[in-house]
């Protein structure tokens, strides 16, 4: 039987989603152990979006197969019981067709990056936002972001460790919302390159901080080199919001 679970987690204390050979601190392995403790079965968990160290999730999706059948509320509650005191929670569980795959069946992924833009230090949101002290021109950031919409070679916006053979991606939407000192950068696409969202955010922040001409984003795109773009924004401001299927 194949099950789909939707998961929320605080990524601060984990080594990222993916199970590591020399680390027992991945989100994947933590949940797999909770499933074993609940059901007595060893499973392999497959996620819809592999998050890096320190990245959070509001709506991560994963699937796994089990021999035994359980009522869905028992799966959710049973896993959560064995995750108590750990900042991971299963929000829901569903039975799905064997053809469903959390990664390959996804139609769109939604990320949100959270910034607090003020000089006074953040007290309540440490570890959940990126604090940028210099004033940001959000209108310039919006204009620069418009040039990233659509299908592009995004080599300038992927890490040197990115293993994707094709750097072309299509960004469906970039929305930048300002609410007082908080800035939310929301990006959606069917798939992303490694560190793509964080490099885009770091680049947009440099545009907003330096009042760079938004047209310069076209030059960054055309160079197709990582050093043409801005810094990689820190992981703790990034959230995987949801995945559409």
From Swiss-Prot:
Enzyme class: isomerase
CDD domains: PseudoU_synth_EcTruA
Swiss-Prot/TrEMBL keywords: Isomerase, tRNA processing
Keyword Ligase set for record: no
A molecular function GO annotation: RNA binding
Active site: 52
Pfam families the UniProt entry points to: PseudoU_synth_1
Highest taxon of the lineage: Bacteria
Protein family: Belongs to the tRNA pseudouridine synthase TruA family.
PANTHER family, per database record: PSEUDOURIDYLATE SYNTHASE, TRNA PSEUDOURIDINE SYNTHASE-LIKE 1
This protein's name: tRNA pseudouridine synthase A
Lineage start: Bacteria, Pseudomonadati, Pseudomonadota, Alphaproteobacteria, Rickettsiales
Gene name tied to this protein: truA
